[in-house]
Regions:
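A broad, low-specificity signal for short, low-complexity segments enriched in glycine/proline
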Residues: 32-39, 56-58, 110-115
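Compositionally biased P/S/T/G-rich terminal and signal peptide-adjacent segments
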Residues: 44-65
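N-terminal Lys/Arg-rich, disordered targeting/topogenic segments
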Residues: 1-23
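A cross-kingdom signal targeting lumenal/periplasmic-facing segments of multi-pass membrane
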Residues: 107-279
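Extracytoplasmic/periplasmic/luminal assembly and interaction segments
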Residues: 76-117
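Short, charged/polar micro-motifs that form catalytic or ligand-binding hotspots
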Residues: 27, 31, 71-78, 142, ...
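Terminal, regulation- and interaction-focused segments at domain boundaries
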Residues: 59-85
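Hydrophobic membrane-insertion alpha-helices, especially the h-region
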Residues: 22-44
Length: 280
């Protein structure tokens, strides 16, 4: 076989543009597959409202007065208005004062002079177009620049338990500063909003105010969310629903834990490993 015949028998590599096209198609397929898995398939698997079906169509993030997405919804209560007020009082949380000229001056004095103001006002957020129905806080340190706080909105007159259902946004105020979006003076929150959700739930359970607890889907797993002040937050995306005792009758035993679907339990375990790296 001469050299010309040998060259003819050897396969030629595909043209460069064909290889690039093939690589591009593979990359596109990977991106599409990832998008389907991350944004459609997995959320469909772990989205669940079996314990409180009336929440399935509701948004799970608050809004500022300017319409900017605010804090995520991460906690809920089951009980009437008196049940909520009694439970929060028993847990050592104080109703927040309304925002007035007097309360604004007082909170400024608390922050600047490092003096207590245990029922300082919280900034208004909106859910379903309305301001919070109730707001509570628990001091952490001397002044109002460090505090635990939560807002609640009544969203169902009658849930699965035939009692009212409230949704809330629990967060920890770590400092006072300017909003990254509007420049207004506001509190900046700690990024770990799940920790604050747990803090509130622990307080209510320790006070004997919780009959049972379970989860429903909230905003979904979020590693780099931003609230209305531009603060970063991360969350497993679940809402902890706490069924309160009725008529302030203290529960002596631990709260009943109603499990989530298996897919959600697995997702939560994976998230705990991820969140551990975010906390470092």
């Amino acid at each position: 076989m001469n050299s010309r015949e040998s060259d003819a028998a050897m396969p030629f590599p595909p043209p460069k543009h064909r290889r690039l096209k093939r690589a591009g198609l593979i990359a596109l397929a990977v991106v599409i597959g990832y998008a389907i898995l991350a944004y459609l398939a997995l959320p469909a698997v772990w989205t669940h409202y079996e314990h409180q079906k009336g929440l399935a169509e509701l948004p799970m993030v608050t809004r500022t007065a300017q319409g900017i997405p605010g804090d995520p919804i991460n906690v809920g209560l089951v009980g009437d208005n008196k049940d909520v007020l009694c439970a929060m009082h028993a847990a050592g949380w104080y109703p927040a004062d309304p925002i007035t000229l007097k309360s604004s001056i007082e909170i400024a004095g608390s922050v600047l002079l490092d003096r207590p103001y245990r029922d300082a006002p919280v900034s208004n957020l909106y859910y379903l177009g309305r301001r919070e129905d109730l707001a509570f806080e628990k001091p952490d340190g001397r002044s109002a620049d460090h505090r635990h706080h939560v807002r609640f909105w009544k969203v169902l007159d009658q849930g699965e338990e035939k009692r009212p259902v409230w949704l809330g946004d629990a967060a920890f105020d770590k400092s006072v500063g300017a909003s990254r979006y509007t420049g207004a003076v506001t509190h900046h929150i700690d990024a770990d909003v799940d920790a604050e959700r747990k803090f509130l739930a622990t307080d209510l359970q320790a006070a004997g105010m919780v009959e049972a607890k379970y989860q429903v889907t909230g905003v979904g797993p979020t590693m780099a969310g931003r609230n209305g002040g531009g603060d970063l937050y991360y969350t497993d995306g679940e809402v902890w629903i706490l069924r309160l005792v009725e008529a302030c009758r203290k529960r002596t035993g631990p709260a009943i834990v109603i499990p989530s679907p298996a897919a959600t339990e697995i997702k939560d375990q994976i998230w705990q490993a991820v969140a551990g790296t975010l906390r470092k």
